[in-house]
Amino acid sequence: MRSWIPLLVLFAVLAVFAQAGKSSESDESRRRPSKSSESSDSDSKSSDSDSSSSEESSGDVPSEAPNTDSTPVEILAAAKPDSGILLGPGDNRVKRDGLPSFYDIRKKRGLPSAYDIRRK
């Protein structure tokens, strides 16, 4: 009963490889221009352009990649806080003076502090 599951997986893998092979063949046929009956000078020029296009396509960097030498990059430093809070990486807290702390709220309500709760 379960013997058909690996068979389906095998067919799916083969179909993916076959489709990839067809697409790469069609890409190659589009890249190479068809030769026409022109003078030998134009044939030599087209063969030179074929070799240059294959050299360009073999590189890892696509031709549309922006040139990083001409793009200015600004690095902005964070302003150091005057409130005494030491900021860590990814810590964007801002000390607000007007709000009471949890300790102040619990003290005002007559509740034990978090330290007292942990100590017990």
Curated annotation (Swiss-Prot):
Keywords: Signal. Residues 1-18 form the signal peptide. It comes from the Eukaryota. Residues 20-99 are annotated as: Disordered. This is Uncharacterized protein msrp-7. It comes from Caenorhabditis elegans. The lineage of its organism: Eukaryota, Metazoa, Ecdysozoa, Nematoda, Chromadorea.
